[in-house]
Design a protein with these regions (language model features):
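Short acidic-hydrophobic, aromatic-tinged amphipathic segments that line or gate anion-handling sites
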Residues: 18-29, 82-96, 263, 278-285
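Terminal amphipathic helices with adjacent charged low-complexity linkers/tails
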Residues: 64-111
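Active-site diphosphate/adenylate-binding microenvironment
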Residues: 114-200
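Redox- and metal-dependent alpha/beta enzyme cores, enriched for Fe-S-associated oxidoreductases
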Residues: 1-15, 147-150, 162-163, 228, ...
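Thiamine diphosphate
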Residues: 162, 167-336
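Conserved acidic residues
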Residues: 39-40, 82, 150, 300
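Short glycine-rich anion-binding loops that position phosphate/pyrophosphate groups of nucleotides
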Residues: 6-7, 45-49, 71, 157-160, ...
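Glycine-rich, anion-gripping cofactor-binding loops and their flanking helix/strand elements
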Residues: 2-66, 74, 170-201, 214-217, ...
Length: 336
């Protein structure tokens, strides 16, 4: 199971004995994946976040691609789906388990993928924790410090992609929620407050600066509603996701002004404006200490982390390249 972070499958007791893989984006970008072509792919729910998944389908393909969805979506931008099933994915999975013969979870095919995932995630974890204090390190801190059962609301654009690339599996449950779609960055603070209002567990919003700016009005309602919320804000002064586009390397275009769209604002005072407290950690250990002390505490806490979009691009690409090298070495050591 290549688990998108928004599926919720990466965190919980099911990871103890089910083949749930966290490194799908990196695995599918690697040369290793070229030699591991499945006969059948079943895509449950919405189109996954991973661009690596889409590139892999273009590069390697599969005999059958079955899309399972019950919301009338069309999760097939490349028109590769061969079969469509109108069913709620979780319910269909339960019926399959009930009616199909016992599925072998320890066969050679499964073991090959789970072994590759183990190599990939150990490689990725080292980059997140040993590299610069940037978005991958923030994901590592969230993974290690959020209490079991907490709600993690994740903004679109880079936060959900950072989570996809760097969040490992863990038996501790974590409820991950994400707004996806054409207007995915809108209403993030309001969404997080709605989650906080409907849950007794701590709620954390992981967001970028533009997404927060798009819903400052929602954030201002925190004190009036008497809700508790921790906002982990990665601030790269603009739209970091556009630094991943090929046009970012086009010297004839003012990419920074036209695509990154810097706002030039200091977002720290937003905490006081909304009646909350500001925290500005300067490193991974500091961030983990802050999260450990504020998550679940009363009121609004804004954890403001200044990051660099170019650095984050480099870390994502470094992770993909390092996983590719590590898998090649593992195959060589195994005589494969």
């Amino acid at each position: 199971v290549l688990a998108d972070p928004a599926s919720g499958l990466r965190r919980g007791p099911q990871t103890a004995d089910a083949p749930v893989l966290a490194s799908g984006d990196h695995l599918l970008r690697s040369t290793w994946a070229n030699d591991h072509r499945p006969d059948l792919v079943v895509q449950m729910g919405a189109m996954p976040t991973s661009k690596g998944y889409r590139l892999w389908l273009d590069r390697v393909g599969t005999d059958r691609l079955v899309a399972v969805d019950h919301l009338g979506r069309f999760p097939d931008p490349a028109h590769r789906v061969t079969d469509r099933v109108a069913a709620e994915p979780g319910r269909l999975a339960a019926l399959l388990v009930e009616h199909l013969p016992e599925v072998q979870q320890t066969g050679p095919w499964t073991s090959t993928w789970t072994g590759a995932d183990s190599v990939a995630m150990s490689t990725v974890a080292a980059i997140a924790t040993d590299g610069p204090f940037d978005e991958p390190a923030v994901v590592a801190a969230l993974h290690r410090t959020l209490p079991a059962g907490a709600n993690l609301v994740v903004a679109s654009s880079m936060p959900i992609r950072d989570l996809d690339a760097f969040l490992p599996t863990d038996e501790r449950p974590l409820r991950i929620l994400a707004n996806r779609g054409a207007n995915g960055i809108d209403g993030m603070a309001s969404t997080a407050l709605g989650v906080a209002a409907g849950s007794v567990e701590p709620t954390v919003l992981f967001t970028g600066d533009l997404a927060l700016l798009h819903d400052l009005g929602g954030l201002l309602a925190t004190r009036r509603l008497g809700l508790d919320l921790t906002v982990v804000l990665v601030d790269n002064d603009g739209g970091g996701i556009f630094s991943f586009l090929p046009i970012a390397e086009n010297g004839h275009v003012d990419h920074h002004r036209l695509f990154h769209t810097p706002h030039g604002l200091d977002l720290g005072p937003v905490a006081a404006l909304a009646g909350g407290r500001l925290h500005e950690p300067t490193g991974l250990a500091d961030l983990e200490s802050v999260l450990g002390s504020v998550v679940g505490n009363p009121g609004l806490h804004l954890v403001h982390i200044v990051v660099d979009a170019t650095t984050n691009v480099g870390l994502h690409r470094e992770a993909a390249a390092a996983v590719d090298r590590a898998l090649s070495r593992a195959l060589s050591d195994d005589g494969g």
